[in-house]
Amino acid sequence: MEWKYMRIQGREDSWVTKYPKGIFGMCWRMIMDGKMEPEDEKLFREVVDWFIANLPQPEPCRNGEKVITFFKTGTAGEMLPMIEPAVRLMDKYNHPYDIVYTNFIGTVIYEDEWQAAVRVENGKMI
């Protein structure tokens, strides 16, 4: 079976989207709550820096719109090893998450070679 999209998400909802937080949001929350050790925060910031340098940031995300993003599985090969340290931090701090593979993500409002963004309303993709 082939999947078009993949998302790493938590089991707690974002206060903005009312949809499960993505991996970046979960890590930032742990940092803001003082739950992450300084060397782990440094590691996470290196992950973020790599993504900023290598992927476009979707305009709807920059604008704070109610959207969630998915990696495209067909081009995620280079990104997955780069996101892995953040996933290991979830494991280290015993923070629950799910890796979701799907072909159905709702109406795409932003798309590039590596990712797609969809609008979320009342905790549901539209």
Enumerate the predicted regions with their spans.
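Long, contiguous N-terminal structural blocks used for assembly/anchoring
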Residues: 1-76
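Acidic, proline/glycine-rich low-complexity IDRs
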Residues: 88-126
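A residue-level detector for conformationally permissive "hinge/kink" positions
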Residues: 2, 26, 86, 105-106
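Residue-level detector of alpha-helical secondary structure
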Residues: 45-48, 52, 80, 84-87, ...
